[in-house]
Amino acid sequence: KKSSMYFKDLKKLENGLKTLQKDENIKSILLFGCDKNSANAAELEEVLRLNTKPLLGGIFPQIIADGELKEIGFLIIPLFEELEVSLFETQENISIETQLETQITSISREAKSIFCFVNAFWEEKTSFLEALYDELGPVVNYLGGGAGSLSFQSLPCVIANQNIYENAAVIGLTKSPILIS
Protein backbone atom coordinates (compact mmCIF):
# COMPACT_ATOMS: atom_id res chain seq x y z
CA LYS A 1 0.00 0.00 0.00
CA LYS A 2 1.17 3.51 -0.73
CA SER A 3 2.05 5.65 2.26
CA SER A 4 0.57 8.76 0.61
CA MET A 5 -1.83 9.55 -2.22
CA TYR A 6 -1.84 12.64 -4.44
CA PHE A 7 -5.03 13.98 -6.04
CA LYS A 8 -4.79 16.79 -8.58
CA ASP A 9 -8.31 18.15 -8.02
CA LEU A 10 -11.32 18.07 -5.71
CA LYS A 11 -13.19 15.39 -7.69
CA LYS A 12 -10.25 13.02 -7.48
CA LEU A 13 -9.90 13.81 -3.75
CA GLU A 14 -13.59 12.97 -3.32
CA ASN A 15 -13.09 9.57 -4.97
CA GLY A 16 -9.99 8.94 -2.86
CA LEU A 17 -11.78 9.78 0.40
CA LYS A 18 -14.68 7.49 -0.54
CA THR A 19 -12.23 4.63 -1.13
CA LEU A 20 -10.46 5.22 2.21
CA GLN A 21 -13.78 5.03 4.08
CA LYS A 22 -14.08 1.37 3.05
CA ASP A 23 -10.63 0.37 4.38
CA GLU A 24 -11.05 -0.69 8.02
CA ASN A 25 -7.27 -0.74 8.55
CA ILE A 26 -7.07 3.01 7.99
CA LYS A 27 -8.07 4.63 11.28
CA SER A 28 -7.24 8.32 10.62
CA ILE A 29 -6.25 10.64 7.77
CA LEU A 30 -3.82 13.52 7.31
CA LEU A 31 -4.89 15.86 4.49
CA PHE A 32 -2.82 18.62 2.92
CA GLY A 33 -3.93 20.93 0.13
CA CYS A 34 -2.47 23.80 -1.89
CA ASP A 35 -3.74 27.36 -1.60
CA LYS A 36 -3.82 27.70 -5.40
CA ASN A 37 -6.47 24.96 -5.71
CA SER A 38 -9.56 26.22 -7.48
CA ALA A 39 -11.87 24.80 -4.78
CA ASN A 40 -13.12 27.21 -2.14
CA ALA A 41 -13.71 26.34 1.52
CA ALA A 42 -17.41 25.47 1.04
CA GLU A 43 -16.62 23.10 -1.85
CA LEU A 44 -13.86 21.42 0.17
CA GLU A 45 -16.16 21.02 3.19
CA GLU A 46 -18.76 19.35 0.97
CA VAL A 47 -16.17 16.68 0.09
CA LEU A 48 -14.90 16.45 3.69
CA ARG A 49 -18.44 15.57 4.84
CA LEU A 50 -17.99 12.21 3.08
CA ASN A 51 -15.30 11.35 5.62
CA THR A 52 -16.16 9.58 8.87
CA LYS A 53 -12.63 8.97 10.15
CA PRO A 54 -10.59 11.36 12.32
CA LEU A 55 -8.95 13.78 9.87
CA LEU A 56 -6.70 16.79 10.23
CA GLY A 57 -4.35 18.87 8.13
CA GLY A 58 -4.00 22.18 6.42
CA ILE A 59 -3.72 24.26 3.29
CA PHE A 60 -0.17 25.27 2.32
CA PRO A 61 1.56 27.16 -0.52
CA GLN A 62 3.03 23.88 -1.80
CA ILE A 63 3.03 20.18 -0.98
CA ILE A 64 5.47 17.42 -1.83
CA ALA A 65 3.85 14.46 -3.56
CA ASP A 66 5.56 11.58 -5.35
CA GLY A 67 8.90 13.33 -4.79
CA GLU A 68 7.78 16.51 -6.58
CA LEU A 69 6.85 19.98 -5.39
CA LYS A 70 3.20 20.67 -6.26
CA GLU A 71 1.35 24.01 -6.21
CA ILE A 72 -2.02 22.44 -7.00
CA GLY A 73 -3.69 19.38 -5.56
CA PHE A 74 -4.19 17.44 -2.36
CA LEU A 75 -2.11 14.90 -0.48
CA ILE A 76 -3.61 12.26 1.79
CA ILE A 77 -1.54 10.27 4.26
CA PRO A 78 -3.57 7.37 5.66
CA LEU A 79 -2.75 6.43 9.26
CA PHE A 80 -3.25 3.02 10.79
CA GLU A 81 -3.84 4.39 14.27
CA GLU A 82 -6.79 6.41 15.50
CA LEU A 83 -6.08 10.04 16.32
CA GLU A 84 -7.97 12.07 18.87
CA VAL A 85 -8.67 15.28 16.90
CA SER A 86 -9.35 18.57 18.70
CA LEU A 87 -10.00 22.02 17.26
CA PHE A 88 -9.09 25.30 18.95
CA GLU A 89 -10.36 28.59 17.57
CA THR A 90 -10.92 32.19 18.57
CA GLN A 91 -14.00 32.39 20.77
CA GLU A 92 -15.28 35.57 22.35
CA ASN A 93 -15.59 34.42 25.97
CA ILE A 94 -13.35 31.36 26.11
CA SER A 95 -9.57 31.71 26.17
CA ILE A 96 -7.29 29.36 24.28
CA GLU A 97 -5.83 28.20 27.62
CA THR A 98 -9.32 27.29 28.89
CA GLN A 99 -10.11 25.45 25.66
CA LEU A 100 -6.91 23.42 26.02
CA GLU A 101 -7.59 22.59 29.67
CA THR A 102 -11.11 21.41 28.78
CA GLN A 103 -10.24 19.45 25.65
CA ILE A 104 -7.04 17.77 26.79
CA THR A 105 -8.64 14.79 28.52
CA SER A 106 -7.08 12.12 30.70
CA ILE A 107 -6.79 9.96 27.56
CA SER A 108 -4.89 12.80 25.89
CA ARG A 109 -2.42 12.84 28.76
CA GLU A 110 -1.27 9.38 27.64
CA ALA A 111 -0.35 10.75 24.21
CA LYS A 112 3.16 10.07 22.98
CA SER A 113 2.87 12.15 19.81
CA ILE A 114 0.91 15.08 18.49
CA PHE A 115 0.21 16.42 15.03
CA CYS A 116 -0.46 20.16 15.15
CA PHE A 117 -1.46 22.55 12.37
CA VAL A 118 -2.11 26.23 13.02
CA ASN A 119 -3.01 29.18 10.79
CA ALA A 120 0.32 31.00 10.45
CA PHE A 121 -1.55 34.33 10.44
CA TRP A 122 -3.75 33.61 13.48
CA GLU A 123 -3.30 36.30 16.13
CA GLU A 124 -3.47 33.70 18.90
CA LYS A 125 -0.99 31.19 17.45
CA THR A 126 1.81 32.01 19.91
CA SER A 127 -0.55 31.84 22.91
CA PHE A 128 -1.92 28.55 21.62
CA LEU A 129 1.49 26.94 21.07
CA GLU A 130 2.77 28.08 24.48
CA ALA A 131 -0.39 26.81 26.21
CA LEU A 132 -0.20 23.51 24.31
CA TYR A 133 3.39 22.97 25.41
CA ASP A 134 2.48 23.95 28.99
CA GLU A 135 -0.33 21.39 28.90
CA LEU A 136 1.54 18.45 27.30
CA GLY A 137 5.18 19.21 28.07
CA PRO A 138 8.46 18.06 26.52
CA VAL A 139 7.86 14.29 26.62
CA VAL A 140 5.48 14.35 23.64
CA ASN A 141 6.75 14.21 20.03
CA TYR A 142 5.43 17.25 18.13
CA LEU A 143 4.97 17.27 14.35
CA GLY A 144 3.21 19.92 12.29
CA GLY A 145 3.47 23.46 11.09
CA GLY A 146 1.93 26.75 10.14
CA ALA A 147 -0.68 26.57 7.41
CA GLY A 148 -1.62 29.41 5.10
CA SER A 149 -0.75 31.25 1.93
CA LEU A 150 2.24 33.17 0.60
CA SER A 151 -0.22 35.98 -0.16
CA PHE A 152 0.15 36.85 3.56
CA GLN A 153 -3.66 37.03 3.78
CA SER A 154 -5.37 34.95 6.42
CA LEU A 155 -7.70 32.35 4.92
CA PRO A 156 -9.47 29.16 6.00
CA CYS A 157 -6.51 26.77 6.10
CA VAL A 158 -6.85 24.52 9.17
CA ILE A 159 -8.65 21.25 8.45
CA ALA A 160 -10.39 19.37 11.28
CA ASN A 161 -12.61 16.37 10.45
CA GLN A 162 -15.38 17.67 8.14
CA ASN A 163 -14.57 21.39 8.20
CA ILE A 164 -11.95 24.00 7.39
CA TYR A 165 -11.31 26.93 9.74
CA GLU A 166 -9.53 30.28 9.56
CA ASN A 167 -8.61 31.54 13.04
CA ALA A 168 -7.77 28.18 14.49
CA ALA A 169 -5.42 25.31 15.24
CA VAL A 170 -6.03 21.57 15.14
CA ILE A 171 -4.25 18.79 16.98
CA GLY A 172 -4.30 15.04 16.58
CA LEU A 173 -3.07 13.02 19.54
CA THR A 174 -1.86 9.43 19.41
CA LYS A 175 -0.56 7.04 22.04
CA SER A 176 2.21 5.87 19.69
CA PRO A 177 5.48 7.68 19.13
CA ILE A 178 5.82 9.28 15.69
CA LEU A 179 8.86 7.91 13.91
CA ILE A 180 10.23 9.76 10.91
CA SER A 181 12.59 7.82 8.68
Place the predicted regions along the sequence by residue.
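Cofactor- and metal-binding active-site motifs of prokaryotic enzymes
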Residues: 1-181
